[in-house]
Amino acid sequence: MSEEITTNQTVEEEQQTNQPRLSNENIKQEDEEQQVQEQQEQQQQEQQEQIDDQDTQQQEDEFVVLEETKPVEPIRPTPTLQETPQQQKQQTQEQEHEYQDIVQFIDHKGDIVKEDNKNGRTTFLSTLSNRDDFLTKGFDYSVISILGPQSSGKSTLLNLLFNTRFAVMDASTGRKQTTQGVWMGVASTTNNKNETFLILDVEGTDGRERGEDEKAFERKTSLFSLALSSVLIINMWAHDIGRYNAANISLLKTVFELNLQLFQKKRNHKILIFFLIRDHDGVTPLERLKATLMEDITKLWTDLQKPEEFVGTRESDFFDFEFTTLPHKIYSPTAFLGQVEQLKQRFSDSGADSFIPKRKYRNDDIPADGFYQFSYQVWETIKSNRDLDLPSQKEMLALYRCDEFVEQSMTQFTRDIKPIKEHIERGRIQEQFGEKSKRILDQSLSVYDEPAQRYHLETVQKKRQVLTDRILTELKYLFDKQMERLNENTLVFYNSLIKEFTDSNTGSSSGSGNNNNKKRDGSSVLLTAASVGIIPQFSTWSNGIKKKSIEYFEIVANQSIVPGSDWSFENDLEQLKIKIDKELSILKENQLVRLSKLMRDKTFQQELTPLLTKITEQAPNNMWQKIKTYYDDALSSNEKEFRDRLVDFQLDEQKVNELINKFREQLADGLKNKITERAEFLQMRMRKRFEEKFNMDNRNLPRKWTKTDDIASIFQDARQNAEKLIDLFSYLRLDEEDSNVSFFKRLDNDEHEENTMVNSSKIIIPYKDCCLACENFRLTIKSDYMQALSEQNRLTSGGGVPGYMIILLCVLGFNEFISIISSPLLLLLTILLGGVGFVLFKLGLAGPFIDYSSQILVHFISKVKDIVLHVEQLQEQNHNNNNNNNNTPKQKRE
């Protein structure tokens, strides 16, 4: 902190030390100055008495620091003699309203001050965080720092110019160091609230408290001030001009050297070095003082060891210089306060030409909200004795702040995208995804751009790209999810088109009337095809369905791409096309199967089945010739229709031939199955054919057997004719070479054998089944033969029973007849047996009944015989056992 000069003796000694030899004119001037000084001393004594009366409660500490709980009262301007007490009070209240809080940034040890709630210590960061009026300034602020000797009144001057509260020295307690380290404060001038200043009060140079470490710390604080400042105030005494050490020429040298160090890589802006010459008595004009200082500055710049790229440069290439003077504060308080007020106007009136902190001196790389972080990095770098690369520090600041802005933007993005994300993750399509995402992206980038635009442009652009990539990565994830769902929805859309077509087509076919189905033209085939779900002109239709599905996908996919991104849905589209082609391929195969089945069923149901039923029912000897004729006609006509229908599927010739051959095989298999089905009633047909030949005459009337009929020959011919059906139904004879093939061959001995030279795939009834059918048939017709023989024998025996036999039967059987009549049980039994016998006789079943009864009787007798033999064996065993038992005692007795 700066200290107030209050001791007259020190001032007089310093002025005397710097006095040149006096000429006569100088002696006269000295007398005049002596009179002025005496008047000033008298005024000072009067003013001091007034100050003592007002400040009786002044603090007892040697110096005041900001860490104290109660803020230090600032140095207020000494009232002029013309001001009344009421005016003084009003002025004090107005200024009190404008006072600004200040905090220590760097302490005496060179460490950045940390927060200490226990001791009430606040940091510059916490202070700035509560100053929205400063944080929102962007680049519209100026940093003003002050350098100069210790106890030269720096803090007092800052308090008067900017209404700050920097602590000042109490000269009555001794001249000691007050400002320790670096203090900062945000200030605005009274006349212009739009002008905002960040004030740096730097520890004075040449202080005895630091001793040998003074130069090192002085260099660090000077470097720190130069790195941050727009205006650098050099506070110096007028009587020190012309000296090297007292005039702080070494400090200027440090400033020049550090400037070259800071801006070796990049020149940013000029710095205004404002020389404030204190205690100017007016003897030496300001122009002469300015000329002396500029001469020293030029020589100092020339003597500097500059880097190669700065050889030949002038100090004006890096700095602007301004000079002003202030009279002695104690000896000329009225003039001092007046000139301070004028100087204050130069800091507040931005419209005036004499305005000091012009915009061109501002650092446009450090916005207000990033100032603390930048200053923190700068000091840490300086403190660690590393070379300070100011452009790099600004880039580091931009990195730090831009990272914060990126996270803020991502938070905004996450909040805005949440509804869309939830919608997509629930498996739904987000309409206008690309447009909505672009709007959210732009909003998120605007959240970043607005505060970031004030920082290092290249860094901002890099971080903006990082932010854009992060957001686009999140959006790409949702886009991929959208594409997956769109792929599924497109397949659903594709299936809906198919269902809609098939439903409408089937409905129209079912309502078209049955009369059209009786037509033999192509329309009947189309209607029949539609009724079973066959799609006409499949290739044209499938291409249209695929085109509509792809168009649906592309419309939604194009709406899902974020404008400006390099996204593409080509891979998704290719996958969709593959899936649709696969679905269409499956549908095509299904349609071909349906068409094949339709043509097969149509061939059988409408053409072959009625004819086959009729032919197999009659089963003529030329059955297979007729079947082959009808089969070939149906195959030829339907094969032509099948080929015409296959044109709609755009198949290659190989595939068409494959389907036609399969169609032929299916027809042949179907015919074989149909014959097999009809062969299930082979026994009935054989019986029917046998009866037609054996029991019916040439006039197709029931046969009356006569004595001259050769029953055996007729029976054999009828049986052989019926047994031909077995061979007829046992083998498929569609090929020309099979027309004369006999599978169940009859031998001369009336037996049969298997033809092993035939194609086994054409066998309908296996040989064993043929033999079994033949054997069963012969058993069933045996009774017919026996009955015919019985009838013929009855006719051969003459005119029936003789009359005497009837008379003899009546005489001899009269008693039995009476006993039967008298017994109801015997009468009922006789009636039942007689009725059964009469029915059997009339039905011609008497012979089979006798044969069957004979078999039962023989079986019964055999069983009885077995039982009798078994009983005899048991008796013989018992007899033998008894004999053995009788012989055993005899042997014992012997």
Curated annotation (Swiss-Prot):
* Principal place of residence: endoplasmic reticulum
> Could you list which ranges are Cytoplasmic topological domains?
1-800, 846-894
Where is the chain membrane-spanning? 801-821, 825-845
Side Lumenal, residues:
822-824
GO MF annotation list: G protein activity; GTP binding; GTPase activity
**Topology of this chain in the membrane:** Multi-pass membrane protein
Please state what class of enzyme this protein is: hydrolase
Record field: compositional bias (Low complexity): 1-10, 36-48, 78-93
Where do the segments described as Disordered lie?
1-97
InterPro entries assigned to the protein according to its UniProt record, in alphabetical order: G_GB1_RHD3_dom (IPR030386), P-loop_NTPase (IPR027417), RHD3/Sey1 (IPR008803), Sey1/RHD3-like_3HB (IPR046758)
The UniProt keyword set, sorted, is:
Coiled coil, Endoplasmic reticulum, GTP-binding, Hydrolase, Membrane, Nucleotide-binding, Transmembrane, Transmembrane helix
Chain intervals with Acidic residues compositional bias: 49-65
Q: What is its EC number?
A: 3.6.5.-
- List, alphabetically, the GO terms of the cellular component aspect: endoplasmic reticulum membrane; pathogen-containing vacuole membrane; symbiont-containing vacuole
Q: Show where the GB1/RHD3-type G domain sits.
A: 138-361
Gene3D superfamilies referenced in this protein's UniProt entry, alphabetically: P-loop containing nucleotide triphosphate hydrolases (3.40.50.300)
Please list the coiled coil stretches: 21-60
Q: Which GO terms describe its biological process?
A: endoplasmic reticulum membrane fusion; endoplasmic reticulum organization; host-mediated perturbation of symbiont process; regulation of endoplasmic reticulum tubular network organization; regulation of endoplasmic reticulum unfolded protein response; regulation of secretion of lysosomal enzymes; vacuole organization
Positions bound to GTP? G148, P149, Q150, S151, S152, G153, K154, S155
Instruction: List where in the cell it is found.
Output: Endoplasmic reticulum membrane
Family membership: Belongs to the TRAFAC class dynamin-like GTPase superfamily. GB1/RHD3 GTPase family. RHD3 subfamily.
Role according to the record: Probable GTP-binding protein that may be involved in cell development.
Protein name in UniProt:
Protein SEY1 homolog
